[in-house]
Amino acid sequence: MKFLCAEDNAINAEILEMLLEAKGASCTICPNGQEIVDAFASVKPGDYDMILMDIQMPVMDGLEATRRIRSGENPLGRTIPILAMTANAFLEDMQKSKEAGMDEHLSKPVDISALEQTVKRFRVTPPPRK
């Protein structure tokens, strides 16, 4: 699997990258919401399977970045799964994530087994080739 990730904390980004790579996945890390929006604008089918989005980031937060991805010109933005990964763990925070267009809300520190289960739920499996 290939992930496009937004994480402004360098240590958290490194840990996330190591966890994903240990599971055979790859990821591209963007340090703020504006950079992930810009990166997503040129994404083509098959480039990424899912977005992992921090909420509290400089320049543009994850909620606004999600809104822009969902409403942007790239049609993949309407369907790609976006998972919030954030220290904001209250019910109100989860509701804000959903309202912004996120599919799921995971609290930090992220439990790798919880992340795996969530990814499995939202993974889009391509149809078998004929």
Segments from the language model and where they lie:
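C-terminal compact regulatory domains
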Residues: 1-130
